[in-house]
Amino acid sequence: LTGYSAYPRLIDFKRMREIADTVNAVLMVDMAHFGGLVAGKALTGVFDPVPYADVITATTHKTLRGPRGGLILCTEEFKEAVNKGCPLVIGGPLPHILAAKAVAMTEANTPEYREYAKRIIENAKGLAASLMKRGIELVTAGTDNHLMLIDVRPFGLNGRQAESAMRECGITLNRNSIPYDPNGPWYTSGLRIGTPAVTTLGMGLEEMEEIAEVLCSVITKTRSLSRNGKKSSKYVLDEGIRESARARVQKLLERFPVYPGIDLDFLRNAI
């Protein structure tokens, strides 16, 4: 079983196939997080699991950019088992969700989608470089895909504190364990951040530079309130930095709206 949800590099699936074959094992790949990059031909050759895996699981959301849901791909050998298993754990499929999945799959087969997948990785590499030049440490010192892991320990923080501080500033990401994490899976020592959503909005390398500035300002101006080595979720974020970060996030979102061309003022007026 191979795949990843928080690994910022690539897996050689040809090598995984060779290893599985040495012990006559089934190779199963979970590409829930990077399936959209495979569909968009941003991951090809040995980094594309489809030619090498016996069974593949994926989601229809995340990088594939469709509604929430999942799918299973398999070779002819496992077709009967998969077809028997799915009806036992899935019930009441919603027609409008099926239609939305069809739209997502259709989009994934277009040149525009392939450009989107390529730009996800370009933006991730740009954001990673911008963070590192500002002194932010990344696990594996960069990324080859759509995500990166920030190590917040050098700033005296744990992941839970840093995640909450970011949320105060209008930034959505999640705390995440890092290799040999001393803080465990609840507090963690890292932050996971990806670029699919901002790429969908139309942001590019210039915006990645600005996002890096905001992230760095929040991390460096957040102070842990942990005492005597005890883990804690409590922290203090400089109020001026919080307001400045929120304002910059708001301006970015105004420049890159979720629904460009649609007037949503009636919603604001209704509140």
Q: Which residue ranges define each predicted feature?
A:
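Structural beta-strand/beta-sheet cores of well-ordered domains, especially the beta-sheet scaffolds
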Residues: 25-27, 53-56, 68-70, 127, ...
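Short, well-ordered loop/turn and helix-capping segments at boundaries between secondary-structure elements
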Residues: 62, 107, 154, 168-172, ...
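PLP-dependent enzyme catalytic core of the Aspartate aminotransferase-like
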Residues: 123, 185-271
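Generic non-transmembrane alpha-helical segments
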Residues: 19, 126, 130-134, 161-169, ...
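Conserved PLP-enzyme active-site core in the AAT-like
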Residues: 1-135
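Conserved PLP-binding catalytic core of the aspartate aminotransferase-like
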Residues: 137-205, 266-270
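Short acidic (Asp/Glu) and glycine-rich catalytic loops that position anionic groups and cofactors
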Residues: 78-83, 98, 102-108, 141-149, ...
